Design a protein with these regions (language model features):
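Conserved catalytic network of the ASCE P-loop NTPase/AAA+ motor domain
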Residues: 2-4, 37, 82-84, 140-144, ...
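Conserved helicase ATPase motor motifs in RecA-like P-loop NTPase domains
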Residues: 2-22, 38
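Loop/turn elements at helix/coil->beta-strand transitions in domains of secreted/extracellular proteins
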Residues: 4-7, 87-89, 118-123, 145-146, ...
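Conserved nucleotide-binding/hydrolysis micro-motifs of P-loop NTPases
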Residues: 14-18, 36, 96-98, 155-157, ...
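Conserved interdomain linker/interface between the two RecA-like ATPase lobes of SF2 helicase motors
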Residues: 23-126
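Generic recognition of flexible, low-complexity loop/linker segments
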Residues: 77-80, 137-138, 154-156
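Conserved helicase ATPase core of P-loop NTP-dependent helicases/translocases
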Residues: 121-152
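A short beta-strand element within the Helicase C-terminal
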Residues: 148-151, 155-173, 177-183
Length: 184
């Protein structure tokens, strides 16, 4: 509403794959219908508000998590003001390697220091060898109490959670399609 772009680019999280068969039917859905259902975000902000945190002593990892926490708190206030029951979800993607385990532990510690834990149901972990509060029944409802989901790549395709509002990535981009799917 504030910005009046000359061009709007819309994309799908599902890549176009060549089919060897014509045994499928095509369904056309208007973009406005998909946006109205909350399946597509109206805007994507990259590193929003990072420059507003002015404590030089914070390491970059803590800085990024603090920015995500602040943005989430801002969204919570806006949803409450609009009488909405949406509880915004922060997705935190960590690397696959051993570094990922270190990142997970550091993130869990940062959240725990703010009183946000797996035990109180506000943190979910979705990794191959560790699954806490991660069922779709727990994560997807708009009013779910889970506020933060730590994952590697388990949710890359076919997972729909309209309340997912913020994505924090600590992992390198290795595939453009994977990147589009994750953001989508």
């Amino acid at each position: 509403e504030i910005v009046k772009p000359d061009l709007t680019i819309e994309m799908s999280a599902t890549p176009v794959l060549a089919s060897k068969s014509n045994n499928f039917s095509r369904v056309t859905v208007e973009p406005s219908d998909v946006i109205e259902e909350g399946m597509i975000k109206k805007e994507v902000l990259i590193n929003y508000g990072i420059d507003k945190i002015d404590n030089d002593e914070l390491d970059s990892q803590k800085l990024i998590i603090e920015a995500a926490i602040e943005k989430r708190e801002e969204l919570v206030k806006l949803y409450k003001k609009a009488n909405s029951r949406v509880n915004p979800l922060v997705l935190i993607q960590i690397p696959n390697s051993d570094i990922g385990e270190d990142k997970k532990n550091a993130i869990v510690s940062l959240l725990r220091n703010r009183g946000i834990t797996e035990e109180d149901g506000r943190v979910a972990i979705w990794l191959n060898d560790e699954k806490i509060n991660n069922s779709s029944e727990t994560l997807v409802p708009l009013d779910s109490k889970v506020e933060y989901l730590i994952f590697k790549q388990a949710i890359d395709t076919g997972w729909d959670c309209p309340r997912a509002q913020i994505l924090v990535r600590f992992r390198e981009i290795n595939s453009v399609i994977f990147e589009i799917q994750t953001v989508g």
